[in-house]
A protein has these predicted regions:
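N-terminal edge beta-strand
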Residues: 4-32
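Acidic glycine-/aspartate-rich tracts in secreted/extracellular proteins
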Residues: 10-14, 41-46, 54-59, 97-100, ...
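Residues within well-ordered beta-strands of beta-sheet-rich folds
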Residues: 29, 35-39, 92-94, 103-107, ...
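Negatively charged
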Residues: 30-33, 68, 77-80
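Extracellular/periplasmic metallocenter environments
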Residues: 45-47, 72-121
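Charged, alpha-helix-forming regions
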Residues: 121-206
Length: 206
């Protein structure tokens, strides 16, 4: 479960952007059974009612969806008609089991949104780093599983959903054969942040 703040930015036309992430109209991943709040209270959203459907700019999806304006639950028609004049605007969805592929879009203008993939095991989109991730986290246990596509950019960061820096990170490449890298820098102490060992290998710590 998560809350995403939504705003509209100019990016080859108006586009939705989540949590001030650097990319617009991204594909979202939401976990079945999770509850997600899309907060469209930013002033840029006033003329762009944020809705979810089963097709891009198409049929509205209502299963598990609640619309709120100024803290009051309203119908879909009241939500879209009163969106611009409301101070706070939220769409809340609890993703049902076996939910279809969904889409988020503006009920007035086309071309602003993107796709929503739903899943039963992977987790949900995270925008805390410079690279978008899919995170399934257990903050009580201090453990999370993160999936992402790297961009070979030095200094890139990823969100992990734990709220604190993890002491150990284990990285497994999915598109090539390579030993699992285990980051141990935070155990070794200050100045050792980049150090790691490899599972199934005999090299020294690097």
């Amino acid at each position: 479960s998560a809350t995403y703040t939504v705003k509209v930015v100019s990016d080859s036309g108006n586009k939705y952007r989540f949590n001030n992430f650097g990319t617009s109209a991204v594909t979202l991943d939401l976990a079945e059974g999770g509850t997600y709040t899309f907060d469209g209270s930013d002033s840029s959203m006033s003329g762009h009612p944020f809705v979810i459907g089963t097709a891009a700019n198409g049929t509205v999806y209502s299963t598990g969806v609640t619309y709120q304006l100024d803290g009051v639950s309203v119908t879909y028609s009241a939500y879209t008609s009163g969106y611009a004049s409301a101070s706070t605007r939220k769409l809340i969805i609890t993703v049902p089991a076996s939910a279809p592929v969904l889409y988020y879009w503006c009920s007035i203008h086309s071309g602003m949104g993107g796709q929503i993939n739903t899943n039963s095991t992977l987790g949900s989109s995270n925008f805390d780093g410079s690279t978008q991730t899919i995170v399934k986290a257990n903050t009580t246990a201090g453990f999370s599983i993160v999936s992402y596509s790297g961009n070979d950019t030095s200094g890139s960061t990823i969100g992990h959903g734990l709220g604190v820096v993890p002491q150990i990170t284990i990285i497994k490449r999915r598109i090539a054969s390579e030993d699992w890298m285990v980051g141990i820098g935070h155990i070794l102490g200050s100045g050792k942040e980049g150090h790691y060992v490899k599972l199934n290998a005999t090299e020294a710590e690097g």
